[in-house]
């Protein structure tokens, strides 16, 4: 009798590696590092998903309370700029993937706070691993701004890799 693969094994979905991207050099480094270490030789054990959290125009302008005079004119301009930035971020990430011969990539741009968008996308794709770049903020700046990577490390329901860009020596 011929041996056949277990049908459960052949139909098992490929695990997902999710990489959070933004316009920073730290994000670009984290994506490049991920591609070099997990997606070389045109094969990988993972499906690649990239997510960019696009802030809303109101959060970017800081309009949490009553709208000030002139906001109606400014918000569409800010929103247009944020959409252009998001398109550039997504395109640059896609180009880097293509350069590294990774063509089967999903890129999502989602409006919202980066921490929530990233953790929600982990859940949506049932990611096994989340990769985020480290901006290398000091303790005070991290305490004031909050760290997206720290938040994700504590709230994402998967393994989280924080990729630090090596400091250049002078």
Language model segments and positions:
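Small/aliphatic-rich secondary-structure junction motif
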Residues: 3-75, 83, 98-105
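Gly/Ser-rich helix-loop-strand patches that form or flank binding pockets
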Residues: 1-7, 120-170
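Charged docking surfaces used in two-component/phosphorelay signaling
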Residues: 109-117
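Flexible, glycine-rich phosphate/dinucleotide-binding loops
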Residues: 57-59, 116, 169
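Active-site phosphate/pyrophosphate- and oxyanion-stabilizing loops and adjacent acidic/basic residues
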Residues: 32, 95, 150
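Short, surface-exposed alpha-helical segments at coil->helix boundaries
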Residues: 79, 83-91
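Generic structural signal for residues in well-ordered beta-strands
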Residues: 104-107, 160
